[in-house]
Structures are given as C-alpha cells and as structure tokens.
Amino acid sequence: MNTITVYEHSNFQGLHKTFTSDVPNLVNESFNDCISSVKIVGQPWILHQDINYSGQCLPLEEGEYSGISMNDGASSLRLITDDLSNPQITVYEHVNGGGKALVLTEETNLAFGNMHDNISSHRVQRGAWALYEHINRGGRCIVARAGEYLANYCTIGFNDQVSHVYPLRAGKTSVTATILWDRKKVESERNVQIDQYFYTNNTSIEQQFTATSTKEFEKYVSHSFEFSNETSIKVGTSFTLKGVVDINTEVSNTFTVKKGETESFTTRKKAELSMPVKAPPRSKLTVNFMCKEITISVPVELKIVRGSKTDIETGTYRCESGTETYIDVQSLPIS
C-alpha cells in the first residue's frame, strides 16, 4: 500500500491525515497550507504549492520527514505510480529535442559536464525524474514522468536552468511467499539406526518391558530456501514462509528468509528414546531404535511488489527432518 501521512506541525505533531491516492485540492480535505511534516510508505509523492498539481513542487520518497522545505505551503498531493525500477531520460540542448542530447540512467550533477544550465527539452523513456535548478537537488524543480515529452522549457519558465537530475526511487520491495504444498516432492527418505538393545525372555510367559536407548538422540529439522537463478530480489530483502515444520509441536511455524543473509536454519531438540516392547515366551529380541530421515522440496510462489509494479517469481523451500522415531523388533526363538 502506498500512503502519505501529513501532519499539521513538525516532528509529526498536531492534526494528521493519511492519503492513498492523488489529492488535487487539499482545501476539500480541510488540510490546505498546513503541512509541516510527512511520513511516506511505498512510492514517492509530490507536494505541490497550488491546487491541481501546479506551482512549485517537492518530491519526497519513502521515509519520515520531521520538517519540510514547503512548510505550510502544500495545496495538492500527487502519487507517483510509474515503474521506477529502470529509469532513463534524454535531455536536449535546444527546444524540440534539438542540439546535443544526453541520455541519463542515474542521478547526475550537470555542473560536472557540458549540459549545465543548458537544457531546453526532454523525453522520459522510463521512470520518474526530478530536474533541479541548482546542484545537490537544490532550488526549484520539475517532475518528469514516463512517456512525457516536454518540447520547450520556455513554456514553464525553466529554460537553461537545470543543474541536477535525479531519478525518483521506489520504496522497499514487498515480498509475499506462498508455499505450494500440493506440489510437494519427496527427494529422499531413509531409515537410520540410532541404537540397539538386546533382551532375552527365558520364561514360558510373554514378558512386557520398556526398552530405553543409552545414547543421546537429537531430533532435528533443517529449513532452507533457494532463489531462482533469474531472481530480481536484491540482497537484504526479507519475507516470511508460513506453515513450515516446527520441531517442538511438529506443526506449522514460520521461517523468515533474508536474501544473502538468512536463507537456512536448523533446530535441534534432545529426546529420550523409550518404548514399550513385548517379548514372546522363550525368545531372544533385538530391538533397533530407528529414525526416519526425510527430505522434501516444495515450490514457493513469490509475489514481488515494487511501488505500482507486481512480479511473480518462484523459489524452492526444502526441509530435511529427523523427528520420527520408532523401533524395529526382531525375535528369534531359543531352545
């Protein structure tokens, strides 16, 4: 959800309101010319000095702003809905796209080149851009959005005045993971002997006893997540897998994945192996304490939201567990 919360006073004090879409006239919201601090989640917003998105503007990206330069001066708000993932703008020396052309894909201080205060038109291929009057994002600015072609800066009083160009950035990437359990696969399954116990019943009566392992045993569950080779998710992005196995209850739990940092973990729990056994009359028993180890893999659908753009990727959740214990009893008669 893309939101802007505006506050009457600095430091997020006083009356406040939250908006999720464009506001052409803050008078109608009883919040005109009174915004002093702002909190933004998701895509950037543009604060405009006049109604209907006109006058001076102030672009703000995701974050908390305890004070703003347009203090008590905003009359309209606009949400940037463009895809901001791969920005590109071409600026031109003359009107109508004439003269020298400069293609930009990142923030640029024009004072370091030959286009400083020498731009008269632009065309935006992708993203949304803020073009500033002074270096270091200072002075007046205009906002240019994807698909826009502004042929003559003279019409807006901005000819030969651009010194700094900045591509607006989307907020943090949101990832929602869904484990597709109906497509679960068992990759491997094996039975492992933990301990062995011997018992002899020399009587003519069936005997019942409790077999207890003398070895320490640990139940374990290992979880891992594997991203696809083509993933667009960047290092540091985190999301939660719900419904994974918990070692204590052996039911659903959660696993938080953080790309490049936490993509696997293992839990262990000591367990005492003690099970009832019946020994037939005049028999020798071999009691094998066993553990079933199983590895499963399950596809995971990842819904990735970057501002107004949504992508779907797949990954793999893998779980290796050794929590199921049992006994295998072999009986031989004795004479």
From Swiss-Prot:
Epidermis specific. Keywords: Repeat. One of its GO terms (molecular function) is structural constituent of eye lens. The keyword Ubl conjugation does not apply. GO terms for biological process: lens development in camera-type eye; visual perception. Residues 2-42, 43-81, 87-126, 127-169 form the Beta/gamma crystallin 'Greek key' domain. InterPro entries: Aerolysin-like, Beta/Gamma-Crystallin, Beta/gamma_crystallin, G_crystallin-like. The keyword Iron does not apply. Has a two-domain beta-structure, folded into four very similar Greek key motifs. PANTHER family: BETA/GAMMA CRYSTALLIN, BETA_GAMMA CRYSTALLIN 'GREEK KEY' DOMAIN-CONTAINING PROTEIN. Belongs to the beta/gamma-crystallin family. This is Epidermal differentiation-specific protein. It comes from Cynops pyrrhogaster.
